[in-house]
Swiss-Prot record:
Lineage, top ranks: Bacteria, Pseudomonadati, Thermodesulfobacteriota, Desulfovibrionia, Desulfovibrionales
Organism name: Maridesulfovibrio salexigens (strain ATCC 14822 / DSM 2638 / NCIMB 8403 / VKM B-1763)
SUPFAM superfamilies reported in the protein's UniProt record: Ribosomal protein L13
The protein, known as: Large ribosomal subunit protein uL13
The encoding gene: rplM
Function, in words: This protein is one of the early assembly proteins of the 50S ribosomal subunit, although it is not seen to bind rRNA by itself. It is important during the early stages of 50S assembly.
Annotated InterPro entries: Ribosomal_uL13, Ribosomal_uL13_bac-type, Ribosomal_uL13_CS, Ribosomal_uL13_sf
Gene Ontology biological process terms, A to Z: negative regulation of translation; translation
PROSITE patterns, sorted: RIBOSOMAL_L13 (PS00783)
Subunit structure, as described in the record: Part of the 50S ribosomal subunit.
Keyword list, A-Z: Ribonucleoprotein, Ribosomal protein
Length: 142
């Protein structure tokens, strides 16, 4: 018997909505990464993108444990000499809360072309409104 490898037409991608309010960042990110990879499906194959679309709401209301609000730092570089900028998690949640969840999930996905394809299926919003109601997303509870 040959090993089954899913084709593009065999993969049924669904849309899910996650409310991130009062959820711990790392635990939420692992669940989202598993959905994006498709690890919860029977047809999971490491070299094929079998994952679903995930819409995350209330990204600004996530929780973290310990002192991470003040101690966890995010770095970016402006590509100019001396242009290394750093922000704490507290500042990031005030300015760009979407980036916090995207960064956490991106770190849990493969670091190759497939990972870039998977992260495009993640949609993160700070409020409760999102433009993906036409896809009729299912509510996902963790």
């Amino acid at each position: 018997m040959k090993t089954y490898i899913p084709k593009d037409e065999d993969i049924n991608r669904e849309w899910f909505v996650v409310d991130a309010e009062n959820m711990v960042l790392g635990r939420l990110a692992t669940q989202i990464a598993n959905k994006l990879r498709g690890k919860d499906k029977a047809m999971f194959t490491p070299h094929v993108d079998t994952g679903d679309f995930v819409v995350v709401l209330n990204a600004d209301k996530i929780k973290v444990t310990g002192n991470k609000m003040d101690q966890k730092t995010y770095y970016k570089h402006t590509n100019h000499p001396g242009g290394l900028k750093e922000r704490t998690l507290k500042v990031m949640l005030e300015k760009k809360p979407e980036v916090v969840i995207e960064t956490a999930v991106r770190g849990m996905l493969p670091k190759n072309r497939l990972g870039k394809q998977m992260i495009k299926k993640l949609k993160v919003y700070a409020g409760t409104e999102h433009p993906h109601t036409a896809q009729q997303p299912k509510v996902l509870e963790f």
